[in-house]
From Swiss-Prot:
It is an enzyme of class 4 (lyase). Mg(2+) binds at residues 287, 336, 361. The gene is ENO3. Mg(2+) is required for catalysis and for stabilizing the dimer. It comes from Arabidopsis thaliana (Mouse-ear cress). Its cofactor is Mg(2+). GO terms for biological process: glycolytic process. It comes from the Eukaryota. The modification N-acetylserine is found at residue 2. It catalyses: (2R)-2-phosphoglycerate = phosphoenolpyruvate + H2O. Belongs to the enolase family. This is Cytosolic enolase 3. It is found in: Cytoplasm; Nucleus. HAMAP family: Enolase.
């Protein structure tokens, strides 16, 4: 092929001439840089390579990380994992070889990306999120993504989403907003974990989390300040109570002292809030995670106590009485998983009382079929969104739409095994979920999410809207 034939085939002369003319019209001070950027924009970006690797999450357990290559650059994503997996959530693929990371290796998921998913996606337009996600679902051919692994599929889905935003030259949160069909973006109220228990901490506290929500702040930046100050006041309160001794932190960064009762924990948090001076502007939320201490039809609140007497078993009716009492005595606005994950009846009844927001996590598992059932039966009134329980960005957007159409609240959530990826921050803003639950204002994998929200608020400038008092339905 001659030089002229090569130029003609790729229309190089025309493209270069257009770039030069554009530089002249713009009267740019750096025409070479302008021309280079102009030519780069003229190239239709496609996925050219997908490379996965095994990394460690915040607990030292393997997870999947992906580098997705396009003509615009390399886009990285990594996925979190929980302390357990539910029956109705997408399958996290692990090797099961006890000789490798005690059976937790994700080498199979990594291989599936490098050999199968990569081949299927090369040449696709990263802006077409729905098509990319559907291509992986079709390749997997199972209802719960057990063939390729939801951890493999989600890592690629998130990386593609980041690449799509870059191709459009918009922030990731804006790209997600566009994908969801929303006209507005909203900075969420952070639900900071301040006390940890349950499966997330090595203490005697059966309840999984007590959180604070700075709904009275005017901006996310102020909310973050209040959360940090309350957290450190709480640390001081616990130290004083323990005679100057500190305490451990849980997997999500929350403080984890030995606590004998839910009321004791709430009193500690109440005192910390009082010390900040933001009393009426900071509310409390609780993740009961009742499934973890449900034995048959009873709830054992002493399940983690070394000196358990067996006298602290509660029926579902007893639990409802307890919730009524604490919601009357403390500024509690939201309770997550107040009953066992299969106890639809009592969850529905408690929700009907209208005492506070009732969030479904273990009850729903971000599963569209269970969300649909809960909507039809009025079982709860808020969704805890865990993207890794679904497996793709597109499906996450769809389940949020279901919740919003039902006038539910939505809480975007982290997992106990987190990574340095801050995708859920952009997701929460783009989908205007109203609340984000990303752990304590402590530990890098948690603060990474909150710090990203600071950057988003700064980037949005005068257009930034903080959910604040409208945290339930950020419309």
């Amino acid at each position: 092929m001659s030089v002229q034939e090569y130029l003609d085939k790729h229309m190089l002369s025309r493209k270069i001439e257009d770039a030069v003319n554009a530089a002249v019209r713009a009267k740019t001070s750096d025409p070479v840089l302008f021309i280079a950027n102009h030519l780069k924009k003229a190239v239709s970006s496609v996925i050219t390579k997908v490379k996965a690797r095994q990394i460690l999450d915040s607990r030292g357990i393997p997870t999947v990380e992906v580098d997705l290559h396009t003509n615009k650059g390399v886009f990285r994503a990594s996925v979190p994992s929980g302390d357990s997996s539910g029956t109705y959530e997408a399958i996290e693929l692990r090797d099961g070889d006890k000789g490798m990371y005690l059976g937790n290796s994700v080498a199979k998921a990594v291989k599936n990306i490098n050999e199968k998913i990569s081949e299927a996606l090369i040449g696709m337009d990263p802006k077409l999120q729905g098509q990319i996600d559907q291509a992986m679902i079709d390749l997997d051919k199972t209802e719960k993504k057990s063939e390729l692994g939801a951890n493999a599929i989600l890592a690629v889905s998130i990386a593609a989403c980041k690449a799509g935003a870059a191709e459009k030259e918009v922030p990731l949160c804006k790209h997600l907003s566009d994908l969801s069909g929303r006209a507005n973006m909203v900075l969420p109220v952070p639900a900071f974990t301040v006390l940890s228990g349950g499966k997330h901490a090595s203490n005697t506290f059966a309840i999984q989390e007590i959180m604070i929500l700075p709904i009275g702040a005017s901006r996310f930046e102020e909310a973050l300040q209040w959360g940090s100050e309350t957290y450190h006041h709480l640390k001081a309160v616990i130290s004083e109570k323990n005679g100057g001794l500190g305490c451990n932190v849980g997997e999500d960064g929350g403080l984890a002292p030995d606590i004998s009762s839910l009321k004791e924990g709430l009193e500690l948090v109440k005192e910390a809030i009082n010390r900040t001076g933001y009393n009426d502007k900071i509310k409390i939320a609780i993740d009961i995670a009742a499934t973890n201490f449900c034995l048959g039809t009873k709830y054992d609140l002493d399940i983690k106590s070394p000196n358990k007497s067996g006298q602290n078993f509660k029926s579902a009716e007893d639990m409802i009485d307890m919730y009524k009492e604490i919601c009357n005595d403390y500024p509690i606005v939201s309770i997550e998983d107040p009953f066992d994950k299969e106890d639809w009846e009592h969850t529905k009844y408690f929700s009907s009382l209208g005492i506070c927001q009732v969030v479904g996590d273990d009850l729903l598992m971000s599963n569209s079929k269970r969300v649909e059932r809960a909507i039809q039966e009025s079982s709860c009134n808020a969704l805890l969104l865990k993207v890794n329980q679904i497996g793709t960005v597109t499906e996450a957007i769809e389940v949020v739409k279901m919740a919003r159409d039902a006038q539910w609240g939505v809480v975007t959530s982290h997992r106990c095994g987190e990574t340095e990826d801050s995708f859920i921050s952009d997701l929460s803003v783009g989908l205007a979920t109203g609340v984000i639950k990303a752990g304590a204002p402590c530990r890098g994998e948690r603060t990474m999410k909150y710090n990203q929200l600071l950057r988003i608020e700064e980037e949005l400038g005068d257009q930034a809207v903080y959910a604040g008092e409208d945290w339930k339905l950020s419309l």
